[in-house]
Structures are given as structure tokens and as C-alpha cells.
Curated annotation (Swiss-Prot):
Record PTM Phosphoserine, positions in chain: 360
Function summary: May be involved in spermatogenesis.
Gene Ontology terms: cellular component: cytoplasm; cytoplasmic vesicle; nucleus
Keyword field contains S-adenosyl-L-methionine: no
Tissue/organ expression: Expressed in heart, brain, placenta, lung, liver, skeletal muscle, kidney and pancreas. Expressed more abundantly in heart, pancreas and skeletal muscle.
Disulphide bridges, residue numbers: none
Organism: Homo sapiens (Human)
Subcellular location: Cytoplasmic vesicle
Remaining remarks: Strongly down-regulated in 40% of primary laryngeal carcinoma and in 6 of 10 various cancer cell lines.
Keyword list, A-Z: Cytoplasmic vesicle, Developmental protein, Differentiation, Phosphoprotein, Spermatogenesis
Full protein name: Gametogenetin-binding protein 2
Subunit structure: Interacts with GGN.
UniProt entry tagged with the keyword RNA-binding: no
Amino acid sequence: MARLVAVCRDGEEEFPFERRQIPLYIDDTLTMVMEFPDNVLNLDGHQNNGAQLKQFIQRHGMLKQQDLSIAMVVTSREVLSALSQLVPCVGCRRSVERLFSQLVESGNPALEPLTVGPKGVLSVTRSCMTDAKKLYTLFYVHGSKLNDMIDAIPKSKKNKRCQLHSLDTHKPKPLGGCWMDVWELMSQECRDEVVLIDSSCLLETLETYLRKHRFCTDCKNKVLRAYNILIGELDCSKEKGYCAALYEGLRCCPHERHIHVCCETDFIAHLLGRAEPEFAGGRRERHAKTIDIAQEEVLTCLGIHLYERLHRIWQKLRAEEQTWQMLFYLGVDALRKSFEMTVEKVQGISRLEQLCEEFSEEERVRELKQEKKRQKRKNRRKNKCVCDIPTPLQTADEKEVSQEKETDFIENSSCKACGSTEDGNTCVEVIVTNENTSCTCPSSGNLLGSPKIKKGLSPHCNGSDCGYSSSMEGSETGSREGSDVACTEGICNHDEHGDDSCVHHCEDKEDDGDSCVECWANSEENDTKGKNKKKKKKSKILKCDEHIQKLGSCITDPGNRETSGNTMHTVFHRDKTKDTHPESCCSSEKGGQPLPWFEHRKNVPQFAEPTETLFGPDSGKGAKSLVELLDESECTSDEEIFISQDEIQSFMANNQSFYSNREQYRQHLKEKFNKYCRLNDHKRPICSGWLTTAGAN
């Protein structure tokens, strides 16, 4: 608590106030100096939170000296605006405004380490501004006490005034420990000044006391004579019944009309004890028949006057201390907000924006989970009814195998529609997604995980898939050989390489111009194994081309197909290990089984688009498809055993559109594969795994 350290005898304008000292106005004749001790605002002796202090030091270091100086200045409007919002007591608000105005005029360092400028601006001392630890203690240790202090002040429910500014506090109350508290907080100089009683003030208290208790004329005259003896106007030796012991400890100054009271604590307590019945409301007979009784009444009035004075000092001290604390904490809070706003401007984002961003992120994650659940339920309902009706050509054993594969969502039966006698090799795979449609050509293997595809890949192949990878890395550029979607589109080269379909090493996937260009360059290295092998490959290509051309004649009558509402997904897959004969496909027409591959490619654009649409409109005039380019790369002359670098560069220069649209091709294949996986999520474990991986990415 603040202490009373001095008395302003010549006026407060001439007194040299030190730091944290303010004048305390008691009455017209008394003004004391009020001082706040250093331990109230100790900036070095607190144990701070290490993590918060480290963060504050980092934020403090972000600001330049100029920015820090600007941040550590607030105007009086900001302080008084916060005052009107936080403090409900009108007496407290007026006291804070009065004290702030006094400090602006006088310039006293009453709020150190805060300073008040002549223009009404509030700032911090230079030593505290440059020391991050002191500034942190000021902002987050002392500054955090503002709301607690305001909430701790008792307030009236009627007018929201605090007890110190309520009208009831001006009335003297029964004696308690308040006078002792304020007596202990006074210096010796202040005590001597308090017990110096002005005779005119004592006479006013005495007259009020006589009127209140309605003394008779004789008794009133006796009391007044005892008062005149005390102030030295009458000679005590001439008064009969005068007791000098009653006035012991009292000394008068007739010329200055002062009464000096002994400032010993015991004597003050005894003197105030005489006035206690008056404040307690006790009734006693008020008579002064003799002069000694009149002396006791004078001592009672002296005790009343002294108690009222001490009570007034205690009230002023408490009110001014509360006013000083409010102004100090309001200034610290305003400076802290200014500092944080400056730091937020430097950082570019505020704490409120961070909080909103966190809420938005949580909402986004929640919506994503709900969308995944809805999509999962939608796919489950869409693929709920799946049936596989066996053809008449299937045997009883094959029907059992087909039912088992339907349960596991994998079909591995041989292709009877094509008339092929080779187990595990199929020409046409039809996937029926409607329960009313029948499979015209049972699948012989899983499209993605079939052993035929795995068998066809060379041991040196990296499993590239034209920029689309089902692995977590997803960084491999691919060849059409590893892509089942390319098989669906009819642009794969499975039939072009036979047993060695992946004849090159796709090592630098993303760094190369295109993996297929390197395929064409490296595919010639295998020509050194012999000319006979190359001739065989060439004959295979010719047979495959004839096979594709003859497939148009194998299309069955549209009347044999199911209704237009049924959706059929057909995957055309060529044999990679054995020669494919055109007659094998056409035999299905003789057997009575329809082969609607060509017509289905026209009716289902999402799974079978022409090769030209895959490459987009930017492929350029005269640009060849990948199938034709691959055919040309295989159908080289017997004498040519390698491709020179000039030819490679020439090819890359002539096919710039392919490289410019490379990302479009990848995205197109990725979308196709996603559609395929969504439709076959219940059948293919790899499809569900890919959808989970793609959703996470």
C-alpha cells in the first residue's frame, strides 16, 4: 500500500516530487505527499513462464527500433476510451481523468516506468523499452491485474459506485482499525501535521456537539470556558475545580491559535477512545455542572475532530491509491495492445485470423470426411446389384468357378466367346454393371492384377504408367505398357512386343522428355539379338493390324444386345505371349455369342474414347497417334540396328505438341482410372486402395 512520506507546506507546485509520488489533497489546510514503494512494480524479481518469455523476446526482436518506439506510444483518447468501457464507477472515472490531467500539466514521474508527455501521450521509459524481460513483466505480469483489480472493487447495486466514492463513506463510522492502518502508513512529519489541530476547527466541532445533545445554558457555558482554558485565553488558576491532568499531552499556541496533541500512539488511542461512544450511538447524560466535567466534554470533541480527520485521510489515501492503480494498469494495457498490433502488422496475420483459419480447417476436414462417407455409400448403392449369368457354352464346373469368382469380385474363367483354347489369355473382357445384363464374354483375370499382365512385363520394367502411379510417391512417368486404362483405350503396345513387352529401362521418369520417346530409342537395342526375332515381331504386328481391321465384321446384331438402359464396360485385351489370329475372334459370331466391342466403344465415351480425343486439340495437324508411332518404331529395316541422336532430336522437335500436352494426357488417364476404380471398387481391392491413397493425397 502507498505511504504518506511528506507534507506540502508551500504548495504542491513547489514541491520536488520524485518517481511514483503524487500529491494527496486532504483539506484546505493540509496536502500530503503520497508515494508508491518500488516493490509494488518490481520488474526483475518475478519468475516468468519460460516458453512465453522466449516467444515474447522473439516478437520483440522482430521490431526495429523505430517501429518499437512508435508502438510504445498511446494517446490520452485511447486510455480514456478504455476507462469508460471498463470502469463502471463514475467517481473512479472522474478521479482518473483528474489525475491524468495533473500529470500532463506537472510532468511528474508518478507512473514510472510509464511516462506522460506534455501533449497527453503515454509512453514507456527508454530502459524498459529496450529490455525485453522488463517489458514482458510489465505487460503480462503487472498488466494482467487490471481486470482482477476492477472486479475486486465492491460496487453499489443501485448506482454502480464503489464504496470509496459512495456518499455513505463520508459519514463517520464506529471506530475500527482504519485509523491505526493509516497511522502506521504515515511518516513522523505527517503524524505531527495531523495532530496539529486548528482552534477554529475544534470550536466548530464543539458547537455542533453542544447543539446535537442540547446542553443547557449553564452547562454550555462551562464547556466553552473549558475550551478557552485549553487555547490559552483564560487563566486556569482562577477556575474553581479545574483539573490540569485532563489536559496533559496537549499544548496550545495562542498566537497561531493551534493545539498540539501528543503524537504517541497510546495517547491517540486513549483520546479516540473517549469519542467511541459518540460514534457507537450510546446514550449518556449530557451535563457539565463543574469545570472538570466540561474539560472531559472538550476532550471528547477533540477526539471526534481527530478521528474525523484520520478517517478523511484514510479515505483519501485509499481512493487516490485506487485511482493511481487504475491509471497505471489502463496505460499498461493500452501499450500492450499497441505492441501486439504492431507485431501483428509485421507478421501479416493476427491472432483472430489464425483462430478463424483453425476453425475453417477443422470445418474443411469435417466436410471432407462427410463427403467421403457419402461417396462411399453412393458407390455401395450403385454397385449393390451385380450378377453374372453363365453362357450356355459354360460347363457345370465353370459355373461353379464363376460363382466363386463373383463372390470374391474376381473372374478368372477362360474366354469361351472368342473360341480361344488358351487358358488365361483373353481377347475381350466384358464387365456388366447392371443386374439385367449378361456377360457375353467372361473375364479370364483381374484387369489390374491379372497374372497375364504381370507375366508380360519384363523384369527390367519399372512399371511406369504414363504419369499415373498407384504408389504413394506417384512420381513415375509411365509407359502405356503398365496402364490398364491404355488397354481400355486401345492404345497399348501389349501386342507389339510379345513376351518382352517392356524392353527398356524407364529410369529417369520425370527428367526425360517422355518415357515413350526413350522407349523408341532403347527398343532398338534388342534388335541386336537377331534379325529373325525382329521379323517375327514384324509379322505379329501385321497380324494384329489385320485382326483389328476384321473386328469390325464381328459386331453382332444390335437386336441381340440388352436394353439401352444397361451399362456395359468392355475391356479389349490382346494376347502378349502368343500370336493372335483374326479367325479366333470371328468364330464367336459362328458360335452365337455377340462381340459388341466396336459398337460399345461408340456408346460408352467415358471408358472408350478415340485415340485422337485423348491427345487433345493441340496435337497439331499431321500428328500421328501413339499406336502408329510405336508401329513405325518397331517396323524398322533389318539393316538399321540403332537410332541416332540426330533422329531422336528431330523427332522431339517435330512432336513438341506431345510434350506441351503431356500433363493433359496424364490428367486424362488419371480421371479415366478414377472412374474405373469407382465403378469397380467392390470388385478390385487395388481400386479401393487407390481411392484411399488418392483421397489422402
